[in-house]
Swiss-Prot record:
Family affiliation: Belongs to the transferase hexapeptide repeat family. LpxD subfamily.
The protein, known as: UDP-3-O-acylglucosamine N-acyltransferase
Catalytic activity, EC: 2.3.1.191
PROSITE patterns associated with the record: HEXAPEP_TRANSFERASES
Pfam families: Hexapep, LpxD
Function: Catalyzes the N-acylation of UDP-3-O-acylglucosamine using 3-hydroxyacyl-ACP as the acyl donor. Is involved in the biosynthesis of lipid A, a phosphorylated glycolipid that anchors the lipopolysaccharide to the outer membrane of the cell.
Source organism of this protein record: Neisseria meningitidis serogroup C / serotype 2a (strain ATCC 700532 / DSM 15464 / FAM18)
Length: 348
């Protein structure tokens, strides 16, 4: 495929911003350290300004404040250089559209609805009574079981699985190995063994949701597990049954959300976070990587961190200073206690 080429003026005409210097052509986005004359790079953090001076990039995306330090360079000045970089990267890597057609080895049940605009890959399976929207891409070995409903332009990458009865909104993307709608972990103890509770709910994903590789979102026990519009979930995340996750929340890899947790909108949850079940996390909460969330967070906008116990980020950072000194402090405390005890004995 011939690489796309854009001049700086063409980029700003599409995305806004202001170009300065020569109206050069660029063919790709690269990091400052690797960029060459045909590439465009970006400066998101001012502390890396020195890298701009050392870079061979043909052009650099910068903020208006930073631009004054780079006279003579080809620039695009943007309010948010990092977001602008993401949009430029999308220009060079456009969303792949479905090539209509069903591979001869795919299996589509007769009662399924598959528009001609959909692309069904090799060995893929579409179950009975499932309805696909326009322009879906169900790639090799992906499975959509019976009675599902997929919106327009949904993408299932190879070996992704959507269990029966689930609903996916428009432009949902499910990466390889992810499983949507497997049974939740619901068991009742029967005295000498565990009795499995039928999981009769399903999973509902809103528009523009993205689910990473090998992530599992379990179906609800009686009502649906839900994920709101625009939420992005990384690889190897476990979402337990009955969870309700709001819109535009992001969850990083290796996080485990126990059953019946409600998470608000615009939350940021770092990698390796674990939660107990049946709690609520307010809108716009930020949870640092590795945090154990043991109780509800009711105040919106909190920034929490700490392996254990959970606390505000400010409290955790202040207390973390002392962790490596605990042994020394314990020795000093014992010495002081002994001195006080000796002083008490001497006064008798």
């Amino acid at each position: 495929m011939i690489p796309a080429t854009y001049t700086l003026s063409q980029i700003t005409a599409r995305l806004g911003g202001e170009w300065r210097g020569e109206d050069i052509s660029v063919t790709a986005v690269r990091p400052l350290a690797d960029a060459q004359a045909e590439h465009i790079s970006f400066l998101a953090n001012p502390k890396y300004k020195a890298e701009v001076h050392d870079s061979s990039a043909g052009a650099v995306i910068v903020s208006a404040k930073a631009a004054d330090g780079f006279e003579g360079r080809n620039l695009i000045v943007a309010d948010d250089p990092y977001l602008y970089f993401a949009k430029v990267a999308r220009l060079f890597s456009p969303v792949v559209k479905a090539r209509g057609g069903i591979h001869p080895t795919a299996v589509v049940e007769p009662s399924a609805t598959v528009p001609a605009s959909c692309e069904i890959g090799a060995n893929a399976y579409i179950g009975a009574n499932t309805v696909l929207g326009e322009g879906c891409r169900i790639l090799a070995n992906a499975v959509v079981q019976h009675d599902c409903k997929l919106g327009d332009e949904v993408v299932l990458h190879p070996n992704a699985v959507v269990y029966y009865g689930c609903t996916l909104g428009r432009r949902v993307e499910i990466h390889s190995g992810a499983v949507i709608g497997a049974d939740g972990f619901g068991l009742a103890f029967a005295g000498d063994s565990w009795f499995k509770i039928p999981q009769t709910g399903a999973v509902t994903l809103g528009d523009d949701v993205e689910i990473g590789s090998n992530t599992n979102i379990d179906r609800g026990a009686m009502s649906d597990t839900t994920v709101g519009n625009g939420t992005k979930i990384d690889n190897q995340v476990q979402i337990g049954h009955n969870c309700k996750i709001g819109s535009h929340t992001v969850i990083a890899a290796k996080t485990g959300i126990s059953g019946s947790v409600t998470i608000g909108s615009y939350c940021i949850i770092g990698g390796g976070v674990g939660t107990v079940g049946h709690i609520e996390i307010a809108d716009k909460t930020t949870i640092g990587g590795g945090t154990s969330v043991t109780h509800s967070i009711t105040e919106s906008g909190k920034h929490l961190a700490g392996i254990f116990p959970m606390s505000t980020h400010k409290e955790w950072a202040r207390n973390a200073v002392y962790i490596h000194r605990l042994s020394e402090m314990n020795k000093r405390l014992k010495t002081l206690e002994q001195q006080l005890s000796d002083a008490g004995q001497d006064s008798k």
